[in-house]
Curated annotation (Swiss-Prot):
Gene: aat
Annotated source species: Paracoccus denitrificans (strain Pd 1222)
Subcellular location: Cytoplasm
Record-stated family: Belongs to the L/F-transferase family.
Signal peptide range: none
Name of the featured protein: Leucyl/phenylalanyl-tRNA--protein transferase
Matches recorded under InterPro entries: Acyl_CoA_acyltransferase, Leu/Phe-tRNA_Trfase, Leu/Phe-tRNA_Trfase_C, Leu/Phe-tRNA_Trfase_N
């Protein structure tokens, strides 16, 4: 499955809880997945360690939204093994133009050092992938994204598969049926990913302190 997949069909599939992946960057075929255990992160409540708070307090990084979607997707695909193939790259660009795909960039000065991207439907954010060119950049992206999703009214943060890195930030796995219930509820919520600007790092730290 790949040739007949459109951005509209892809959104309809996500609304049912399934998502596509390729076996490799060079593979033409896409396959549908619906894990028995689905990874999620707490909107507005990711765990931020003391060491990460200290790191952010003394760094000069900043975060932006939808500033370089193509660059973030390229960064996520730039690894030895990736499930992002050419058909998916084209679909993500279509979804970005439609307003259903978004990126968060982490920058040191003007350099893109990390980020993540995902899809939105109602109050659900489907995180697709993230990358890091410096230590802690992917953690910073998760922290900023957590704050942003909460500010914009999202209630579900889907990470597809659980993993130890996400678990260290508060991620957990839930059964498929529970995920479907949460997804159905989130789809009824009119969240807007572009409703708020991102805070600077000092405002982000203050927000973390108030909610922890």
């Amino acid at each position: 499955m790949s040739g007949g997949l459109t951005a509209e069909r892809m959104l309809a599939a996500y609304a049912q809880g399934v998502f596509p992946m390729a076996e490799s960057a060079s593979a033409a075929q896409l396959y549908w997945f619906e894990p028995a255990l689905r990874g999620i992160l707490p909107v507005g409540g990711v765990h931020v360690s003391r060491s990460m708070r200290r790191f952010l307090r003394h760094c000069d990084w900043r975060a932006t939204i939808d500033n370089d979607f193509a660059g973030v997707v390229a960064g996520c695909a730039d690894r030895e093994e990736t499930w992002i193939n050419a058909p998916l790259l084209a679909l993500y660009q279509d979804l970005f133009r439609m307003g259903h795909a978004h990126s968060l960039e982490i920058r040191a000065g003007e350099d893109l050092i990390g980020g993540m991207f995902g899809l939105t439907l109602g109050g659900a954010f489907f995180a697709e992938s993230m990358f890091s060119r410096r230590s802690n950049a992917s953690k910073a992206a998760l922290i900023w994204m957590s704050s942003h999703l909460a500010r914009c009214g999202f209630t579900l943060w889907d990470t597809q598969y659980p993993n130890p890195h996400l678990a260290s930030m508060g991620g957990r796995a839930i059964p498929r049926l529970e995920y479907r219930r949460r997804l159905a509820a989130a789809l009824r919520i009119p969240a807007d990913f572009t409703a708020h600007a991102l805070p600077d790092v000092q405002a982000l730290l203050q927000e973390i302190t108030q909610t922890s």
